[in-house]
Amino acid sequence: TYDMQSPCVSVRSGWVAVGDYNGNLIYDISQDGTSKQIDTNLPVKSLSVAANGVVAAILEDGDVTWINVYNPTGEKAVGIKTTMQKSGYPVSVSLSDNGKLMMVAYLKAESGSMKSIVSFYNFDEVGQNYTDTMVSSYEYSDTVIPLAEFTGTHTAYSVGNNQFMLYEGNEIPKNIFQNFMQEEVQDVRSSGNYVAFIFN
């Protein structure tokens, strides 16, 4: 049993990652019941698990926010340093099914208005040729994107307060679809290649 006040939970195939919001521990649990405890040493703000047990977490560290990636043994494999001034504040993180790609939605203030940035990271060979393994990035002015999520190994979506985007790519994901919405989205659900919206 796990005693948590405000749990963050991510489920993918046969894996579940769970950690207390602002807590320092993440439990990476496989379908057969084995569990690995990950000590982040920093408060957890959000997390995501891949279908192979790889875990990504957004961690608060004062003026710096870290996005760390841990392998199923609990060891840190990647650490990405972000600041509000340079990259913006990461509000959502998601791993592809195979754990090789990661998408992050950032919120950034610029010239008195807010914009969102959706960035993709490639932890495979292709990503080694890019700074911080960031292989593609897309900006959306006057938009707040609280949700960015992979739906497989190479397909993903993001939802903002006024628009919806689709992305695709095995190595360098591209924004293949963008649609502005007139109604306010109340909830979003995804399954495989399908995304469903509930409007107010």
Regions inferred by a protein language model and the residue ranges of each:
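Short loop/turn segments immediately following beta-strands, especially the blade-tip
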Residues: 122-128
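Structural motif
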Residues: 24-28, 63-69, 110-122, 161-168, ...
